[in-house]
Amino acid sequence: MAAPLFTIFTPSYNRAHTLSRVYESIAAQTFRDFEWVVVDDGSTDNTAELVGAWAREADFPIRYFHQPNGHKKTAFNRGVREARGELFLCWDSDDTAPSDALQIFRDRWFAIPKVDRDAYVGVTGLCIDEAGAIVGDRYPTSPYDSDTLSSTLGDGIGGEKWGFQRLAVLRDFPFPEFIQGLVGEGLIWNAIARKYRTRYVNDVVRIYHVEPDSLIHSQKTVAKMRGVAEGQCYAAAAFLDHDWRWFAKAPVDVAKIAANHTRFAWHLRRSGRSVRHPPQTFAGWALKLLAWPVGIAAFAYDELGSVRS
């Protein structure tokens, strides 16, 4: 069987109650050269039965993999290893897309001249909410060729976006699985941005759904912050070591990242862990020390919040 153009990848943990709308949205895509890879990260609900039933009825390949719970970082790495497509699209377990989303992605990708394509990692477009409003900022032009760091820190473009990446590139940038707890995707996107460009377009490609349980999980508690503390320290140190030059362009944003290293290092200390992942460069340490008072203040605020709650 020929390899598909797209691998649609969905990581899932006890999301059987939302996966049906993902399946229906994927099944409605007008562009059909794709496979769907579902990595079940230790679910205890009926995800396996649901996906198995869909695999028997669907007219596109569905491949299901179950693994012990290891957070999205391990599920993402597994999806990248198992994928067969040239282009890799991470489709979360509770979102939908317009029926022409894959067609838009395909057309915008092949609009990049073939001779230039190796310099790009993929294509990213806009998201709308359930009411149809654009989530975040539009791009100044469409297409707009840039990268994650330049678009956010350089041009101040923010908000929810969605896109695919070349599988060959993702295989060179795996998530670090030795980190305990969650690891933010920004760690990987920033690393890729140092080497590759992204084509950004003002096409709507995703419908963003807010679930009641996602609102609950988004509430910050000390316990939750300590669960992400190591990943936050690791990502902040990587940024300070590799991307410190952005301080001249976006001093407030970079200072916040530097302060977060101190903040979450103290959360690690309070949880009894010795790992800190400090910066490895002079510039990284200089920025950390510059923002140290803010980081301490943020940590103290977290602690006071836990007392109040």
Where in the sequence are the language-model features?
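Glycine-rich, basic loop-to-helix element that forms the pyrophosphate-binding segment
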Residues: 67-83
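Conserved donor NDP-sugar-binding/catalytic core segment of glycosyltransferases
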Residues: 100-137
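Catalytic core of nucleotide-sugar-dependent glycosyltransferases
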Residues: 205-212, 218-246, 271-274
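Conserved nucleotide-sugar donor-binding catalytic segment
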Residues: 129, 133-219
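A conserved acidic beta->alpha catalytic loop
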Residues: 25, 40-49, 92
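Short, well-formed alpha-helical segments that are part of the catalytic scaffolds
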Residues: 14-28
